[in-house]
């Protein structure tokens, strides 16, 4: 925004030097981009933010200067005479597009003499980079640069049947603008038209067919409000930007529309002669009142860190055009019509800080800061990511919406059909996935095809499990976080990773496995993971682990076997103990014992480990699986030997060999009774 020093001095006394002024304006939010001298005038280039459309005119900038320097703003007094027949006798206006043009006003001036503008007007426009056209057009540009309200003048004789219609453009309709280029219009374009053709693109630029020339005698003066989004879209589509569209995109003062129209009538009649027809055509004369905003001095002190007297707050807000009145806890403020950005208490506090001076805020002011902390869920997720990454598994991110074919490959959690979106989120994808494994399988195949032969992946994301029919939430899915994993051939390595994950999360109890059959997993190659003991009153289903069906592996053109797992993040987080619990280190020596048991083939390691822990209780310091050996000739069919090590230790005394033997004997007796075990001596 270019502003002229001479022009500003018409509205406010310029008591500051150039350097002082630009520094104060910069500190208050109007950044100084540069200055230059034009014909003895100093022109200042200011950066105006998108919420300060009121500063896109000299009066708006002068108002800021007056507030900063504690002076009165001098607004021009408007006086002119109306004569002749009423405006309704010469012109009719119809607004068929109020959603794009909420308000349209028009006045008629008869008998103007179009010619060159006076020297002072030409100098004012040239100083701020506006070209000189003729006295009527120059006045409309002058008023725009004065108050920020764009205006447009039509030649009344060129307005068909004296009718102006604000309407949508028509398909294949064209308009030659005043830049003498043709533009294609459509039904999204707000058009100012007469009874037969378009005369202007609303809020952007007028048309050549109705522009004011030296032959013009009667003019129609337009002053309107156009919706910013409509103007922005039209200007972008047509690649046609103008000073008018720039201002309409940032909103104009609805009350200032009439002021700008009357100001232009005054200047035109003074410079070009003519008479203003009595009255004005206004499609929306009723302007909604601004809502009251409360300002509390205590809140000002809390946010800025300094005390400002209520009288000073009152003075600052009045200097900005607010209507201020007192109430019990502070001030009631009605923002001025030109400040669309003042809607909340914090907005008023920002204005106080700007005018009072950001430099007045003490650097060491105690600003209250609300302490923040991570959610338990976020802390757990960080730890999970750390464990899985340390295990050499890379994190993947895949879409939550997949194809129906992909979702049906593996769904261990439910057999209910997946929910569908009404429209495809991705090409051909409308299904809210019920499992992460199919997406990870697809990602592993894509990595494999790109020569990334080691593509062990995990993902933490939502799955959407359909609710059973007839339940209260049948229309909405159970949207929960799951952890999906996919790796190479080693089933036990992935199981060990899951056990490590539970250990690092401090989950008490025991991770057990049980055979299960689910579509998508190899027959006899899948287990259900369950947490039992300690905090869990009942066994909790943690998830599933198993070999992917060979048909799917072949379908994705993968080699070797693929192991996949999916865990419930909610179960992991709810059972975790994220704050480590200190355990005393025993000062007494431990005893190591190795046991070799002959067991039925059906006995799983977790059953044996459970009996060991039950027998040794708190004296079991460590339990380590060593190996499994089978010899049908010696032990018989369906038998196996399991070798494991026990470390026994007490926190209160030194265990003797007899103590250790007693524990071992109790363990062996339990195994013989419950597992049909035989101890090899």
UniProtKB/Swiss-Prot annotation:
User: Which SUPFAM superfamilies does its entry note?
Assistant: Anticodon-binding domain of PheRS, Class II aaRS and biotin synthetases, PheT/TilS domain, Putative DNA-binding domain
Which GO cellular component term is one of those annotated? phenylalanine-tRNA ligase complex
Is Zinc found in the keyword set? Answer: no
- List, separated by semicolons, the cofactors it needs: Mg(2+)
FDX-ACB domain span: 586-681
Cysteines paired by S-S bonds: none
Where the record annotates domain B5, the positions are 288-363
Binding residue positions for Mg(2+): 341, 347, 350-351
Cofactor descriptive note: Binds 2 magnesium ions per tetramer.
* Record keyword Ligase present: yes
Recorded catalytic activity of this chain's protein: tRNA(Phe) + L-phenylalanine + ATP = L-phenylalanyl-tRNA(Phe) + AMP + diphosphate + H(+)
The EC designation for this entry is: 6.1.1.20
- GO BP term, pick one: phenylalanyl-tRNA aminoacylation
Subunit structure and binding partners: Tetramer of two alpha and two beta subunits.
Instruction: Give the family from UniProt.
Output: Belongs to the phenylalanyl-tRNA synthetase beta subunit family. Type 1 subfamily.
* NCBIfam families for this protein: pheT_bact
The cross-references to PANTHER family, in alphabetical order and at most eight, read: PHENYLALANINE--TRNA LIGASE BETA SUBUNIT, PHENYLALANYL-TRNA SYNTHETASE BETA CHAIN AND LEUCINE-RICH REPEAT-CONTAINING PROTEIN 47
The protein's name is Phenylalanine--tRNA ligase beta subunit
Task: Please name the source species.
Answer: Rhodopirellula baltica (strain DSM 10527 / NCIMB 13988 / SH1)
Q: Gene encoding it? A: pheT
């Amino acid at each position: 925004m270019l502003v002229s020093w001479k022009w500003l001095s018409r509205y406010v006394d310029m008591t500051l030097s150039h350097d002082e002024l630009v520094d104060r304006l910069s500190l208050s939010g109007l950044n100084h981009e540069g200055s230059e001298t034009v014909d003895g005038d100093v022109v200042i280039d200011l950066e105006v933010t998108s919420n300060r459309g009121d500063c896109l005119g000299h009066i708006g900038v002068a108002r800021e200067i007056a507030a900063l320097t504690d002076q009165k703003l001098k607004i021009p007094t408007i006086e002119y005479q109306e004569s002749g027949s009423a405006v309704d006798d010469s012109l009719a206006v119809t607004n068929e597009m109020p959603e794009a043009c909420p308000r349209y006003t028009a006045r008629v001036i008869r008998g103007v003499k179009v010619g060159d503008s006076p020297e002072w007007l030409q100098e004012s426009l040239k100083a701020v980079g506006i070209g000189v056209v003729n006295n009527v057009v120059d006045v409309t540009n002058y008023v725009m640069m004065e108050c920020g309200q764009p205006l447009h003048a039509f030649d009344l004789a060129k307005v068909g049947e004296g009718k102006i219609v604000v309407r949508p453009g028509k398909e294949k309709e064209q308009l030659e603008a005043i830049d003498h280029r043709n533009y294609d219009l459509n039904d999204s374009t707000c058009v100012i038209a007469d009874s037969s053709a378009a005369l202007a693109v609303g809020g952007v630029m007028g048309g050549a067919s109705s522009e004011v020339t030296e032959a013009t005698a009667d003019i129609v003066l337009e002053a309107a409000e156009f919706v910013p989004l409509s103007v922005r879209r039209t200007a972008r589509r047509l690649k046609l930007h103008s000073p008018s569209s720039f201002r309409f995109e940032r909103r104009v003062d609805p009350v200032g529309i009439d002021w700008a129209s009357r100001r232009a009538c005054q200047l035109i009649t003074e410079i070009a002669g003519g008479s203003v027809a009595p009255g004005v055509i206004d499609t929306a004369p009723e302007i909604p009142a601004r809502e009251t905003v409360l300002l509390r001095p205590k809140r000002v002190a809390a946010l800025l860190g300094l005390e400002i007297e209520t009288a000073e707050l009152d003075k600052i807000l009045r200097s900005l055009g607010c209507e201020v009145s007192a109430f019990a806890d502070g001030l009631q403020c009605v923002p001025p019509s030109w400040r669309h950005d003042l809607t909340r208490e914090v907005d008023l506090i920002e204005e106080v800080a700007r005018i009072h001076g950001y430099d007045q805020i003490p650097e060491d002011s105690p600003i209250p800061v609300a302490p923040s902390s991570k959610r338990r869920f976020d802390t757990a997720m960080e730890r999970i990511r750390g464990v899985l990454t340390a295990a050499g598994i890379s994190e993947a991110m895949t879409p939550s919406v997949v194809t129906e074919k992909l979702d049906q490959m593996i769904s261990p959690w439910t057999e209910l059909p997946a929910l569908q979106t009404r429209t495809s989120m991705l090409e051909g994808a409308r299904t809210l996935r019920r499992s992460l494994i199919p997406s990870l399988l697809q990602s592993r195949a894509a990595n494999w095809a790109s020569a990334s032969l080691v593509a062990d992946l995990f993902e933490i994301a939502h799955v959407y499990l359909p609710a059973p029919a007839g339940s209260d939430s049948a229309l909405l899915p159970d949207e929960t976080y799951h952890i999906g994993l996919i790796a190479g051939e080693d089933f036990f390595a992935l199981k060990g990773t899951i056990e490590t994950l539970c250990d690092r999360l401090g989950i008490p109890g025991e991770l057990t496995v049980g055979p299960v059959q689910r579509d998508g997993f190899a027959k006899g190659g899948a287990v259900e993971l369950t947490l039992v003991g300690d905090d869990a009153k009942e066994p909790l289903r943690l998830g599933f682990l198993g070999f992917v069906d060979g048909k799917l592996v072949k379908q994705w053109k993968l080699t070797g076997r693929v192991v996949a797992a999916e865990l419930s993040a909610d179960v992991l987080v709810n059972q975790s103990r994220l704050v480590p619990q200190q355990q005393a280190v025993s000062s007494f020596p431990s005893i190591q014992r190795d046991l070799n048991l002959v067991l039925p083939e059906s006995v799983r390691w977790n059953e044996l480990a459970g009996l060991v822990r039950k027998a040794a209780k708190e004296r079991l310091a460590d339990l380590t699986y060593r190996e499994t050996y089978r010899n049908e000739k010696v032990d018989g069919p369906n038998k196996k030997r399991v070798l494991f090590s026990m470390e026994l230790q007490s926190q209160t005394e030194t265990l003797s060999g007899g103590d250790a033997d007693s524990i071992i004997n109790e363990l062996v007796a339990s195994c013989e009774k419950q597992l049909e075990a035989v101890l090899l001596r």
